[in-house]
Amino acid sequence: MTDLSCLYPSLLCTEAAKTSYDEDTTSVSSGLSPPGSPVDLQNSLDHVKRPMNAFMVWSRGQRRKMAQDNPKMHNSEISKRLGAEWKQLSEQEKRPFIDEAKRLRALHMKEHPDYKYRPRRKPKSSNLKQQPRLNIAMPTIPPQSLFNYSTAFDSLKTHDLSQYYSSFFQSPVLSGSTYAPYNMMAAYARQAAAVAAASQVSASTTPTAPAT
């Protein structure tokens, strides 16, 4: 290993990059299946990992250092802080990591010429379809309570308008105590129409005096 690293120093960098990349992605892939299970072993053999980009090359050392300094900090919070620090770097400061990412990408294409990125989709949980619907029962009101509620609306009834309409007609047709105001209005309207029709009939039957 020492002779090969002296002859090919890039080989040592590549192996170190792969090792660091595996350590960074362990927390993400470990939640899919228990470690050491046959499913996890088969996925690790079949799945080809993406090459690291410039940010991943830069953050692999920064992430480890920040995790050591803040052991209680969540991984998502570390990623947010690293992303903010990466944006503040100048293009000149990012250049070495961009070049390293290009080299790793070219090496990845050489080792896996048929590679095509296929993101893993989360399985759709069928729990949403199987959730029972909420059955909310409407409150039931006994019939006797309905009659008790009706007395509360007695004060909202309209006033007796029979005296008002009686001033326009000689004899009241209906009594306001037994009929609703709208029925009284209809009755008075029918009486007015009958009086108008009778006056038209009497006018048409009255003879006119001959002209001299």
Curated annotation (Swiss-Prot):
Pfam families: HMG_box. The keyword rRNA-binding does not apply. Keywords: DNA-binding, Nucleus, Transcription, Transcription regulation. GO terms for biological process: brain development; negative regulation of transcription by RNA polymerase II; neuron differentiation; positive regulation of transcription by RNA polymerase II. Disruption phenotype: Expression of immunoglobulin superfamily adhesion molecules rig-5 and lad-2 is abolished in the dorsal and ventral SAA neurons, while expression of the neuropeptide flp-7 gene is lost in the dorsal SAA subtype but remains unaffected in the ventral SAA subtype. No effect on the number of rab-3 expressing neurons on a sox-2 mutant background. GO terms for cellular component: nucleus. GO terms for molecular function: DNA-binding transcription activator activity, RNA polymerase II-specific; RNA polymerase II cis-regulatory region sequence-specific DNA binding; sequence-specific DNA binding. It is found in: Nucleus. InterPro entries: HMG_box_dom, HMG_box_dom_sf, SRY-related_HMG-box_TF-like. Residues 48-116 bind DNA. Gene3D superfamilies: High mobility group box domain. It comes from the Eukaryota. Probable transcription factor. Involved in the terminal differentiation of some neuronal cell types. Dispensable for neuronal fate commitment during embryogenesis. This is Transcription factor sox-3. The gene is sox-3.
